[in-house]
From Swiss-Prot:
Belongs to the class-II aminoacyl-tRNA synthetase family. ProS type 1 subfamily. It comes from Salmonella newport (strain SL254). Keywords: Aminoacyl-tRNA synthetase, ATP-binding, Cytoplasm, Ligase, Nucleotide-binding, Protein biosynthesis. Consists of three domains: the N-terminal catalytic domain, the editing domain and the C-terminal anticodon-binding domain. The keyword Zinc-finger does not apply. Its EC number is 6.1.1.15. Homodimer. It is found in: Cytoplasm. It is an enzyme of class 6 (ligase). This is Proline--tRNA ligase. It comes from the Bacteria. GO terms for cellular component: cytosol. InterPro entries: aa-tRNA-synt_IIb, aa-tRNA-synth_II, aa-tRNA-synth_II/BPL/LPL, Anticodon-bd, Anticodon-bd_dom_sf, Pro-tRNA-ligase_IIa, Pro-tRNA-synth_IIa_bac-type, Pro-tRNA-Synthase_IIa_type1.
Length: 572
């Protein structure tokens, strides 16, 4: 490709509305342009990267035995009503009616459509297992699209769905998809972790997220510094303290704390160690409970894990925090003065809280706290559960090493769905025993457009993008200095351009009448891994300057050797 016949569209300045580095660089490098909120046009440079990501995904899915299909973006509402997700999904599901007043949706996922296909096409266990995939545009009406293509409303996704007659068969395919995803992200040159995850609104049993490590990530992921253990922070188990609870050394005293409505204020005003404080959070109880609320207690420096809390049998789902009015109706005190002593509703404490002694907590009286509280002396030990987020330095749940916490960008997610959708849509086949058998499902997604942004978040410097070789828009940039004035520069540039293309190498030759500084800046901005600079001065010695984008290292290579050098560097 020649720049004179190409839409390069680079920008010198960073657009003001671009928050994260990937959004900034995708705009500056001429990869995307915003059409409307959460909607982007992919320009040639961006599309080349997107297609490379897509091709790697397709190759590995085919290698894993998945079968490609293509399903409509527009889906009839009756399928969503049949599955129950018409009511569950929320405003992200874009709903509309056609001219015949029939309701439809723009598909954010395709569980209903593929299950409908399978229930009509398959009849016998002998046809299974099968794993279908597609790479297709999805639409989710995000309330606040942000970070460019990282959280857009329209995006390209690879979604796959497998069907089985046994859990063992599902596990085999799940393991194959796990391995395929690991190969996909490894081939792309990404630093990622596969982490245990919550199944969320999709539902189902086992689940793993594939997270690209990046400071701009929206998810906290935890992993052992020794073993392979890794999990989303929502799912990571906080191990109970291994040391016995210390003996009481203080008497419980009632203290006036009129200006301490938060843990931070309590610690500051009374010079308390924060690890000697307990915070109390009130949430809605399950229906038919004797009490409308449940009290959840965590240590002052810990955070409640809402996913864990929601799974408690005493707690209503979805997790709902009590309002101040609801709290006062039951406790007769405000949210800044709550604690376990004389608490009239069920109490659940975190494992760490159960190991505390001589601690401070609200007295369930406005403007007052108890100091020196001890379990089984001042208040009976309530129900104990793991309800907090882990913190860095906690012991790893697998017993090996301690936990590290980093930010991650979710680029892939695999689920063992079980029979959630097949039961709702009555998808069954005749089993080996001749009886109808409900199918067991798995689903496996990769955010193809998000992968592009995530790769940039891991691969950039002050000059621009530093693409991993496998997904770079071009492999080689040829920069001929003053080619419109120097015949020998132009002749060699054309010769190398043809020879490299003949070797199957993707080349961008900058044949614009631009200053060298502009040419260098543009090629570094769009992140082409290998650059060769052809100039009269070096040609006097039969040399060409070669530069590797990632390391910045430069070297002089003889003109007769440069093609072989690049072929070896790119193809190995």
């Amino acid at each position: 490709m020649r720049t004179s016949q190409y839409l390069l569209s680079t920008l010198k300045e960073t657009p003001a509305d671009a928050e994260v580095i990937s959004h900034q660089l995708m705009l500056r490098a001429g990869m995307i342009r915003k059409l409307a909120s959460g909607l982007y046009t992919w320009l040639p440079t961006g599309l080349r990267v997107l297609k490379k990501v897509e091709n790697i995904v397709r190759e590995e899915m085919n290698n894993a035995g998945a079968i490609e299909v293509s399903m409509p973006v527009v889906q009839p509402a009756d399928l969503w009503q049949e599955s129950g997700r018409w009511e569950q999904y929320g405003p992200e599901l874009l709903r509309f009616v056609d001219r015949g007043e029939r309701p439809f949706v723009l598909g954010p996922t395709h569980e209903e459509v593929i299950t409908d296909l399978v229930r009509n096409e398959l009849s016998s266990y002998k046809q299974l297992p099968l794993n279908f995939f597609q790479i297709q545009t999805k639409f989710r009406d995000e309330v606040r699209p942000r970070f460019g293509v990282m959280r857009s409303r329209e995006f390209l996704m690879k979604d796959a769905y497998s069907f089985h007659t046994s859990q063992e068969s599902l596990q085999e395919t799940y393991d194959a998809m796990y391995a395929a995803y690991s190969r996909i992200f490894s081939r792309m040159g990404l630093d990622f972790r596969a982490v245990q995850a919550d199944t969320g609104s999709i539902g189902g049993n086992a689940s793993h997220e594939f997270q690209v490590l990046a400071q701009s990530g929206e998810d906290d992921i935890v992993f052992s510094d020794v073993s392979d253990y890794a999990a989303n922070i929502e799912l990571a188990e906080a191990i109970a303290p291994q040391t016995p609870r210390a003996a009481a050394t203080q008497e419980m005293t009632l203290v006036d704390t009129p200006n301490a409505k938060t843990i931070a204020e309590l610690v500051e005003q009374f010079n308390l160690p924060i690890e000697k404080t307990v915070k109390t959070l009130l949430v809605k109880a399950v229906k038919d409970s004797k009490s409308p609320l449940v009290a959840l207690l965590v240590r002052g420096d810990h955070e409640l894990n809402e996913v864990k809390a929601e799974k408690l049998p005493q707690v209503a789902s979805p997790l709902t925090f009590a309002t101040e009015e609801e709290i006062r109706a039951v406790i007769n005190a405000g949210p800044g003065s709550l604690g376990p002593v004389n608490m009239p509703i069920p109490v659940i404490i975190d494992r760490t809280v159960a190991a505390m002694s001589d601690f401070a907590a609200g007295a369930n009286i406005d403007g007052k706290h108890y100091f020196g509280i001890n379990w089984d002396r001042d208040v009976a030990t309530p129900v104990v559960a793991d309800i907090r987020n882990v913190v860095a330095g906690d012991p790893s749940p697998d017993g090996q090493g301690t936990l590290l916490i980093k930010r991650g960008i979710e680029v892939g997610h695999i689920f063992q769905l079980g029979t959630k959708y097949s039961e709702a849509l009555k998808a069954s086949v005749q089993g080996e025993d001749g009886r109808n058998q409900i199918l067991t499902m798995g689903c496996y997604g990769i955010g193809v457009t998000r992968v592009v942004a995530a790769a940039i978040e891991q691969n950039f410097d002050e000059r621009g993008i530093v693409w991993p070789d496998a997904i770079a828009p071009f492999q080689v940039a040829i920069l001929p200095m003053n080619m419109h004035k120097s015949f020998r520069v132009q002749e060699l540039a054309e010769k190398l351009y043809s020879e490299l293309r003949a070797q199957g190498i993707e080349v961008l030759m900058d044949d614009r009448k631009e200053r060298p500084g502009v040419m260098f800046a543009d090629m570094e901005l769009i992140g082409i891994p290998h650059t060769i600079v052809i100039g009269d001065r070096n040609l006097d010695n039969d040399d060409i300057e070669y530069k590797y984008r990632r390391s910045g290292e430069k070297s002089l290579i003889k003109t007769g050797d440069i093609v072989d050098y690049l072929v070896k560097a790119i193809k190995g």
